[in-house]
Amino acid sequence: MPKSSSSLESLKHQALGPNSEAASEAFEALTAIGTEEVAQFYLGLLETAQRGWRYRAAMGLMHLGDARAVAPLLRAIQLPETRGCNGTLVYVLTQFDCRHLLKELFQMVFQQGYEAQLMAMMAIEDQDFEYSIEDAAYIQQQWAVAQLAPSESLLELGLENIRELVEEL
């Protein structure tokens, strides 16, 4: 039975409220409802500055299997204010079809924090990709730059591991 509009509005209000336990329960209920209105609500929250809302919305979209989340997730991952705290967003992104996102995933490996880098590397290792010669050249050029002054997190991931992924292109 579909929820009434007033019930959905009440759950949305609760999801954005100050009580974290009630908010978490509201997000779970909204995800279980899973209507187009819920999906639109979640898509809008991917753009918010509020990290907790953004993460819960991303997880909800993942559970709904809504591939419309891919472009907003990419934008949210690339925001300077999410650097260092966007591993969950990268994880959710990699649960969708990423076959055309090889260049973007390598950019995450080269430019993001450890958790996001790790999630992106796992996706690169696990998924099959379709990419152009230009994409491969761009990735190789970015890899050359990253090796000049590798970040601590790149060193932790293992330069040899990354090199192997790049050389497979």
Model-identified regions with their sequence ranges:
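Amphipathic alpha-helical scaffolding segments comprising HEAT/armadillo-like alpha-solenoid repeats
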Residues: 1-14, 33-47, 66-79, 98-110, ...
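Alpha-helix boundary/capping and short turn/kink residues
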Residues: 20, 32-35, 51, 63-67, ...
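Hydrophobic core positions within HEAT/HEAT-like alpha-solenoid repeats
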Residues: 24-27, 43, 57-58, 74, ...
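Amphipathic protein-protein interaction modules
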Residues: 107-117, 121-134
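Terminal, low-structured helical/coil segments at or just beyond the last alpha-helical repeat
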Residues: 145-169
